[in-house]
């Protein structure tokens, strides 16, 4: 699915699979942002760090994957804490 948004005053179209849009929306909601605000913030962070963005859609996919991996780690840690509390 494609979505157009304005980054640094330029209308940009991003094409991502629906699952990635859903994950970005989830991340944005957790941060109290709109999806467009989150994407703009991520773009700004990449530009500040690297000075260029070669494949922003790919960067967003990797960001979503990392978010899911971190969430999985947190759930696993909480599960261990719960098991220890029951012992």
Predicted regions mapped to residue ranges:
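A detector of short terminal or domain-flanking linear segments
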Residues: 1-8, 85
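Amphipathic, hydrophobic secondary-structure cores in small proteins
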Residues: 6, 10-59
